[in-house]
Amino acid sequence: MISMLLADSELELVPREIVGYPAVRLNARKRNKSPAKSILDASLHHSAMRALPMGDRRGRPDIVHVFLLVALESVLNRVGQLRVYIHTRNNEMITIDPTTRIPKNYPRFVGLMESLFEKGSVPEREPLIVMQRDRDIGACIGEIPHEKVILLSPKGRRVRLSDYVKECDNALFILGGFPKGEFISDVLSEADDTISIYEESLSVWTVASEILVNYENHVLEASAPS
């Protein structure tokens, strides 16, 4: 089994500094939502986000959405060999039950995340997604069972993933949940190993897919009759 943690994910509610901006208020009105309870989305709020620190990398719930679809629909998850977690830029930790079916429709996913921020868990009766607040990256890692922490970074040492995963049982893989720049959390000091799997930067869902398929092949080979 392995775990994946999407760190410093750009998933947050609209910051109070920009709730009064026209782009934010207009979109919230169309959706019959309070601006302050709306998910920040660069595709909708880009004009207002110029006023935010690091505004050019924030408001990317789509990255979380695609990552979760790739991970939770993987064969590795279906055979019970994967656990998935999200850490946000504001130090929330989101734990996702492996049986969760993430909406493929993006607006529905955004609505689900807005409910999660408001209620702390969804669905209400039998929660499958749970948020904990005030969890920095170290606290998140401390709550996830693991034997080794592996950070994926373009600056890491190059490895052949098909060979590398053979020594990764019970490992925690950390991937960046942002579109550009560096980790804002001190992830490097938490990692036992920092690796790269390609000569160029890759999207997080591509990296996740490569890890999932290679580890799945390792599991299948290990369980095959000799």
From Swiss-Prot:
<comment type="subunit">
    <text>Homodimer.</text>
</comment>
<dbReference type="GO" id="GO:0070475">
    <property type="term" value="P:rRNA base methylation"/>
</dbReference>
<feature type="binding site">
    <location>
        <begin position="197"/>
        <end position="202"/>
    </location>
    <ligand>
        <name>S-adenosyl-L-methionine</name>
    </ligand>
</feature>
<dbReference type="GO" id="GO:0019843">
    <property type="term" value="F:rRNA binding"/>
</dbReference>
<keyword id="KW-0699">rRNA-binding</keyword>
<keyword id="KW-0694">RNA-binding</keyword>
<feature type="site" description="Stabilizes Arg-60">
    <location>
        <position position="62"/>
    </location>
</feature>
<protein>
    <recommendedName>
        <fullName>Ribosomal RNA small subunit methyltransferase Nep1</fullName>
        <ecNumber>2.1.1.-</ecNumber>
    </recommendedName>
</protein>
<keyword id="KW-0949">S-adenosyl-L-methionine</keyword>
<feature type="binding site">
    <location>
        <position position="176"/>
    </location>
    <ligand>
        <name>S-adenosyl-L-methionine</name>
    </ligand>
</feature>
<dbReference type="GO" id="GO:0070037">
    <property type="term" value="F:rRNA (pseudouridine) methyltransferase activity"/>
</dbReference>
<feature type="site" description="Interaction with substrate rRNA">
    <location>
        <position position="108"/>
    </location>
</feature>
<dbReference type="InterPro" id="IPR029028">
    <property type="entry name" value="Alpha/beta_knot_MTases"/>
</dbReference>
<feature type="site" description="Interaction with substrate rRNA">
    <location>
        <position position="101"/>
    </location>
</feature>
<feature type="binding site">
    <location>
        <position position="181"/>
    </location>
    <ligand>
        <name>S-adenosyl-L-methionine</name>
    </ligand>
</feature>
<keyword id="KW-0808">Transferase</keyword>
<dbReference type="InterPro" id="IPR029026">
    <property type="entry name" value="tRNA_m1G_MTases_N"/>
</dbReference>
<comment type="similarity">
    <text>Belongs to the class IV-like SAM-binding methyltransferase superfamily. RNA methyltransferase NEP1 family.</text>
</comment>
<keyword id="KW-0690">Ribosome biogenesis</keyword>
<comment type="function">
    <text>Methyltransferase involved in ribosomal biogenesis. Specifically catalyzes the N1-methylation of the pseudouridine corresponding to position 914 in M.jannaschii 16S rRNA.</text>
</comment>
<dbReference type="InterPro" id="IPR005304">
    <property type="entry name" value="Rbsml_bgen_MeTrfase_EMG1/NEP1"/>
</dbReference>
<dbReference type="InterPro" id="IPR023503">
    <property type="entry name" value="Ribosome_NEP1_arc"/>
</dbReference>
<keyword id="KW-0489">Methyltransferase</keyword>
<feature type="site" description="Interaction with substrate rRNA">
    <location>
        <position position="104"/>
    </location>
</feature>
<dbReference type="Pfam" id="PF03587">
    <property type="entry name" value="EMG1"/>
</dbReference>
<feature type="site" description="Interaction with substrate rRNA">
    <location>
        <position position="60"/>
    </location>
</feature>
<keyword id="KW-0698">rRNA processing</keyword>
